[in-house]
Protein backbone atom coordinates (compact mmCIF):
# COMPACT_ATOMS: atom_id res chain seq x y z
CA UNK A 1 0.00 0.00 0.00
CA UNK A 2 0.96 3.63 -0.31
CA UNK A 3 1.41 3.88 3.46
CA UNK A 4 4.12 1.21 3.34
CA UNK A 5 5.79 2.86 0.34
CA UNK A 6 5.79 6.45 1.58
CA UNK A 7 9.00 6.06 3.59
CA UNK A 8 10.77 4.22 0.76
CA UNK A 9 9.74 6.31 -2.25
CA UNK A 10 11.03 9.85 -2.72
CA UNK A 11 8.62 10.99 -5.46
CA UNK A 12 5.02 10.17 -6.35
CA UNK A 13 3.80 11.02 -9.87
CA UNK A 14 0.02 11.04 -10.16
CA UNK A 15 -2.79 12.36 -12.35
CA UNK A 16 -4.37 15.64 -11.26
CA UNK A 17 -6.27 15.45 -7.98
CA UNK A 18 -4.79 12.18 -6.72
CA UNK A 19 -2.32 14.05 -4.52
CA UNK A 20 -5.10 14.74 -2.01
CA UNK A 21 -5.38 10.99 -1.33
CA UNK A 22 -1.62 10.72 -0.87
CA UNK A 23 -1.52 13.68 1.53
CA UNK A 24 -4.35 12.09 3.54
CA UNK A 25 -2.20 8.96 3.80
CA UNK A 26 0.76 10.95 5.13
CA UNK A 27 2.81 11.61 2.00
CA UNK A 28 4.49 15.03 2.06
CA UNK A 29 3.28 17.51 -0.57
CA UNK A 30 6.95 18.05 -1.48
CA UNK A 31 7.06 14.46 -2.75
CA UNK A 32 3.88 14.62 -4.86
CA UNK A 33 3.83 15.72 -8.50
CA UNK A 34 0.40 15.88 -10.13
CA UNK A 35 0.25 15.93 -13.92
CA UNK A 36 -2.40 16.67 -16.51
CA UNK A 37 -2.62 14.73 -19.77
CA UNK A 38 0.41 15.33 -22.01
CA UNK A 39 2.47 16.85 -19.22
CA UNK A 40 5.98 15.48 -18.79
CA UNK A 41 8.33 15.45 -15.83
CA UNK A 42 11.91 14.28 -15.50
CA UNK A 43 13.28 12.28 -12.60
CA UNK A 44 16.99 11.55 -12.88
CA UNK A 45 17.38 9.61 -16.16
CA UNK A 46 13.66 8.96 -16.64
CA UNK A 47 10.88 10.99 -18.22
CA UNK A 48 7.31 10.34 -17.09
CA UNK A 49 4.45 11.39 -19.37
CA UNK A 50 0.87 11.48 -18.15
CA UNK A 51 -1.26 10.38 -21.12
CA UNK A 52 -5.00 9.96 -21.74
CA UNK A 53 -7.10 6.98 -20.73
CA UNK A 54 -10.86 6.44 -20.77
CA UNK A 55 -12.13 5.49 -17.33
CA UNK A 56 -13.42 7.27 -14.22
CA UNK A 57 -12.09 8.09 -10.80
CA UNK A 58 -13.32 7.81 -7.25
CA UNK A 59 -12.48 6.02 -4.06
CA UNK A 60 -15.82 6.44 -2.29
CA UNK A 61 -19.43 7.37 -2.91
CA UNK A 62 -19.74 10.97 -4.00
CA UNK A 63 -16.21 11.54 -5.34
CA UNK A 64 -16.52 10.02 -8.81
CA UNK A 65 -14.77 12.13 -11.47
CA UNK A 66 -13.02 14.16 -8.74
CA UNK A 67 -9.56 13.25 -10.04
CA UNK A 68 -8.04 12.61 -13.44
CA UNK A 69 -7.49 9.07 -14.76
CA UNK A 70 -4.50 8.39 -16.97
CA UNK A 71 -2.13 6.09 -18.76
CA UNK A 72 1.63 6.55 -18.41
CA UNK A 73 4.69 6.63 -20.60
CA UNK A 74 8.10 6.00 -19.04
CA UNK A 75 11.11 6.89 -21.15
CA UNK A 76 14.81 6.31 -20.63
CA UNK A 77 17.75 6.39 -23.01
CA UNK A 78 17.33 2.64 -23.49
CA UNK A 79 13.57 2.03 -23.29
CA UNK A 80 10.20 3.55 -24.16
CA UNK A 81 7.45 1.92 -22.07
CA UNK A 82 3.67 2.35 -22.07
CA UNK A 83 1.30 1.53 -19.19
CA UNK A 84 -2.38 1.69 -20.20
CA UNK A 85 -3.90 1.76 -16.73
CA UNK A 86 -7.64 1.08 -16.72
CA UNK A 87 -9.16 2.25 -19.98
CA UNK A 88 -11.90 1.64 -22.46
CA UNK A 89 -10.83 1.42 -26.09
CA UNK A 90 -10.72 4.68 -28.01
CA UNK A 91 -8.83 6.94 -30.41
CA UNK A 92 -6.50 8.07 -27.63
CA UNK A 93 -4.37 4.96 -28.18
CA UNK A 94 -3.57 5.95 -31.78
CA UNK A 95 -2.84 9.50 -30.64
CA UNK A 96 -0.43 8.19 -28.00
CA UNK A 97 1.28 5.98 -30.59
CA UNK A 98 1.63 8.88 -33.02
CA UNK A 99 3.02 11.25 -30.37
CA UNK A 100 5.26 8.90 -28.36
CA UNK A 101 5.53 5.54 -30.11
CA UNK A 102 6.87 3.15 -30.97
CA UNK A 103 7.08 1.51 -27.56
CA UNK A 104 9.56 -1.22 -26.70
CA UNK A 105 7.10 -2.66 -24.20
CA UNK A 106 3.43 -1.96 -23.45
CA UNK A 107 1.52 -3.14 -20.39
CA UNK A 108 -2.09 -3.29 -21.56
CA UNK A 109 -5.27 -3.68 -19.53
CA UNK A 110 -6.97 -7.01 -20.24
CA UNK A 111 -9.51 -8.34 -17.82
CA UNK A 112 -12.52 -7.50 -15.68
CA UNK A 113 -14.59 -6.50 -18.71
CA UNK A 114 -18.22 -6.68 -19.71
CA UNK A 115 -20.01 -5.35 -22.80
CA UNK A 116 -21.85 -2.91 -20.49
CA UNK A 117 -18.51 -1.47 -19.33
CA UNK A 118 -17.06 -0.80 -22.79
CA UNK A 119 -16.35 2.84 -21.96
CA UNK A 120 -14.07 1.95 -19.06
CA UNK A 121 -12.60 -1.51 -19.73
CA UNK A 122 -11.46 -3.04 -23.01
CA UNK A 123 -12.55 -6.38 -24.35
CA UNK A 124 -9.48 -8.62 -24.96
CA UNK A 125 -9.63 -8.12 -28.73
CA UNK A 126 -9.58 -4.36 -28.19
CA UNK A 127 -6.56 -4.76 -25.93
CA UNK A 128 -4.61 -6.37 -28.76
CA UNK A 129 -5.73 -3.64 -31.17
CA UNK A 130 -4.80 -0.92 -28.68
CA UNK A 131 -1.28 -2.40 -28.50
CA UNK A 132 -1.07 -2.09 -32.28
CA UNK A 133 -2.44 1.47 -32.07
CA UNK A 134 0.23 2.62 -29.61
CA UNK A 135 2.88 0.97 -31.82
CA UNK A 136 4.06 -1.54 -29.22
CA UNK A 137 6.86 -3.92 -30.15
CA UNK A 138 5.72 -6.31 -27.39
CA UNK A 139 2.61 -6.18 -25.21
CA UNK A 140 2.01 -7.73 -21.81
CA UNK A 141 -1.63 -8.18 -20.75
CA UNK A 142 -2.27 -6.90 -17.22
CA UNK A 143 -5.37 -6.60 -15.01
CA UNK A 144 -6.28 -10.27 -15.39
CA UNK A 145 -5.78 -13.36 -13.24
CA UNK A 146 -6.16 -11.57 -9.90
CA UNK A 147 -9.29 -9.97 -8.47
CA UNK A 148 -12.66 -11.01 -9.87
CA UNK A 149 -14.84 -8.04 -10.78
CA UNK A 150 -16.60 -9.44 -13.85
CA UNK A 151 -18.46 -12.57 -14.91
CA UNK A 152 -15.94 -13.91 -17.44
CA UNK A 153 -13.85 -16.98 -16.64
CA UNK A 154 -10.34 -16.69 -15.23
CA UNK A 155 -8.70 -17.81 -18.51
CA UNK A 156 -10.97 -15.91 -20.90
CA UNK A 157 -8.94 -12.66 -21.01
CA UNK A 158 -5.57 -14.26 -21.73
CA UNK A 159 -6.95 -16.80 -24.20
CA UNK A 160 -8.81 -14.17 -26.20
CA UNK A 161 -6.08 -11.53 -26.18
CA UNK A 162 -3.34 -13.96 -27.25
CA UNK A 163 -5.55 -15.29 -30.05
CA UNK A 164 -6.29 -11.77 -31.37
CA UNK A 165 -2.68 -10.66 -30.91
CA UNK A 166 -1.55 -13.60 -33.06
CA UNK A 167 -3.97 -12.47 -35.80
CA UNK A 168 -2.47 -8.96 -35.59
CA UNK A 169 1.15 -10.22 -35.44
CA UNK A 170 1.56 -8.56 -32.05
CA UNK A 171 4.11 -10.35 -29.82
CA UNK A 172 2.77 -11.03 -26.32
CA UNK A 173 4.81 -11.45 -23.14
CA UNK A 174 3.10 -13.85 -20.75
CA UNK A 175 5.18 -14.18 -17.59
CA UNK A 176 3.72 -16.25 -14.78
CA UNK A 177 2.27 -14.17 -11.99
CA UNK A 178 5.28 -12.86 -10.07
CA UNK A 179 7.84 -13.92 -12.70
CA UNK A 180 10.41 -11.18 -13.36
CA UNK A 181 11.19 -10.15 -16.92
CA UNK A 182 14.14 -8.34 -18.47
CA UNK A 183 12.93 -5.65 -20.84
CA UNK A 184 15.91 -5.58 -23.16
CA UNK A 185 16.12 -9.37 -23.42
CA UNK A 186 15.51 -10.56 -26.99
CA UNK A 187 13.00 -13.20 -25.88
CA UNK A 188 10.12 -12.49 -23.53
CA UNK A 189 8.27 -15.27 -21.67
CA UNK A 190 5.59 -16.57 -24.03
CA UNK A 191 4.60 -19.93 -22.55
CA UNK A 192 0.85 -20.56 -22.21
CA UNK A 193 1.24 -21.55 -18.55
CA UNK A 194 -2.44 -20.88 -17.72
CA UNK A 195 -3.39 -23.95 -19.79
CA UNK A 196 -1.77 -26.11 -17.08
CA UNK A 197 -4.08 -24.72 -14.39
CA UNK A 198 -7.34 -26.54 -13.67
Question: Where do the model's predicted regions map?
Answer:
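Active-site HxH/HxHxD metal-binding segment of metal-dependent hydrolases
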Residues: 1-41, 51-57
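Structured loop/turn residues at beta-strand edges in well-structured enzyme cores
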Residues: 7, 27-30, 46, 67, ...
Amino acid sequence: SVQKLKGKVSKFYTPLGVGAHLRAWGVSSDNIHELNWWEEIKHEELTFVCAPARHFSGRAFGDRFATLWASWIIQSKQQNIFFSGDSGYGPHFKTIGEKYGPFDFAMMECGQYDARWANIHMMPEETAQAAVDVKANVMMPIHWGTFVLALHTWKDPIERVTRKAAELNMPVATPRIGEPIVLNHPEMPAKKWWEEIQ
